[in-house]
Amino acid sequence: MKCAHFIDGPHCVKACPAGVLGENDTLVWKYADANAVCQLCHPNCTRGCKGPGLEGCPNGSKTPSIAAGVVGGLLCLVVVGLGIGLYLRRRHIVRKRTLRRLLQERELVEPLTPSGEAPNQAHLRILKETEFKKVKVLGFGAFGTVYKGLWIPEGEKVTIPVAIKELREATSPKANKEILDEAYVMASVDNPHVCRLLGICLTSTVQLITQLMPYGCLLDYIREHKDNIGSQYLLNWCVQIAKGMNYLEERHMVHRDLAARNVLVKTPQHVKITDFGLAKQLGADEKEYHAEGGKVPIKWMALESILHRIYTHQSDVWSYGVTVWELMTFGSKPYDGIPASEISSVLEKGERLPQPPICTIDVYMIMVKCWMSDADSRPKFRELIAEFSKMARDPPRYLVIQGDERMHLPSPTDSKFYRTLMEEEDMEDIVDADEYLVPHQGFFNSPSTSRTPLLSSLSATSNNSATNCIDRNGGHPVREDGFLPAPEYVNQLMPKKPSTAMVQNQIYNYISLTAISKLPIDSRYQNSHSTAVDNPEYLE
């Protein structure tokens, strides 16, 4: 008879014995072979088997070991995390206690707010009153008196012609602040076409010492020599004024009073922007200046400046256009016959200064662009430099002046101003301020060479010269070795033969010290400060 399931000895069973108690109280484990016969497992197989020998014994379970490892790892991570948290918390507490202690030690701790603006490393020279002497009164106005004088630096054997601007006695604190603000701006600039301060003397009445400019202001210079000024000179001056204004823009300075009267002539080939009485320094993030009040030159101002007292570099561009118009008309008055109080309404209606007779449409269109109502539509100073530099390479194409090719201006060494100064003082050691501040090679080893440009070609006698332009500033320019127009934008103009003509000084009046009170005030300068009297060109 055949068993239905498995055979265990003489018995038929449904399953082989697994852990059945046998002899000697031992557990019996059997497995079924290929013939379905139950066979004994190896004695070492204590949990059953699947085949003969030790190979048939089942492996032990690894689950408990794995579980123990996972639990142990998690516990380690928790311990490490708690340790890091405690360390960071302790560090935060220590820093907080340190900061609290520092705040208690100091009365005030200002937070850092970097502006990103470069530091102003300009040098301001403080002069002693014994270092300079006043020679003659050049003029005076509401702000005080301007003298012609000499600066003799302490411990040095040089004499430098200077202009000394002295505030009047009993000046208000506001006027003192204004002149010191002007000194700050002038001391901060360093460009061949911008006047710079030489020094300041802090006596009871503040005195500004600037370079003496022998030819005076450009406005009177072009009026006096209009029959000898050719297209080359006019375009060169336009380039140089634009370069000076572009430098101010790069230094975040708004001039606010650019006009031909505020440009000084060092030589016929070299002009400098001056008069920083209204200039303002903008911050790194500032784009415009809002004025609160004071006298302003209405006829040179942009429309937004007149209406809203907003001043930007683009409002200076408007003033530049008016200045160019003054040059091209040889010193005509802008909007002559129109009261300053009506200028804003005239401009709002679209009226502008007319085209000068000598100007081609190319030049006049540049002026028109400067007078656009939309400030952003006006050209930048760097663009004006490029435009006028191109024109200066071919002057007769852009300015039509009868007899242009025969015109020339006197040599700088024929200056009547310096000649008068030398007749009164011992000028053996005189040097120009440019050479003193930026001396050329061999300056200290060869005194005679260094002074030749100032002393040569002085043969004629001098007479007092009348003027209607009072100096407000001088300058500290970078030396230019007698300065001749740069070849990239100038076709050199030189006289065919030396001229003995003497240039009348257009910016200074020679007045005796006893006659100061009788000097008529210059209408263009009298209202530059808040203490000034009324003037139609400068209105509140």
Swiss-Prot record:
Q: Name one GO molecular function term.
A: ATP binding
**Mutagenesis or variant effect for H270D:** In thermolabile v-erbB
InterPro entries for this protein: Egfr_JX_dom, GF_recep_IV, Growth_fac_rcpt_cys_sf, Kinase-like_dom_sf, Prot_kinase_dom, Protein_kinase_ATP_BS, RTK, Ser-Thr/Tyr_kinase_cat_dom
Give the reaction(s) catalysed. L-tyrosyl-[protein] + ATP = O-phospho-L-tyrosyl-[protein] + ADP + H(+)
What are the BP-aspect GO terms? negative regulation of apoptotic process; positive regulation of epithelial cell proliferation
Please give the GO cellular component terms listed in this UniProt entry.
Answer: plasma membrane; receptor complex
List the PANTHER family hit by this protein, alphabetically: EPIDERMAL GROWTH FACTOR RECEPTOR (PTHR24416:SF91), TYROSINE-PROTEIN KINASE RECEPTOR (PTHR24416)
Q: What is this protein called?
A: Tyrosine-protein kinase transforming protein erbB
Q: Which organism is it from?
A: Avian erythroblastosis virus (strain ts167)
Q: What is the lineage of its organism?
A: Viruses, Riboviria, Pararnavirae, Artverviricota, Revtraviricetes
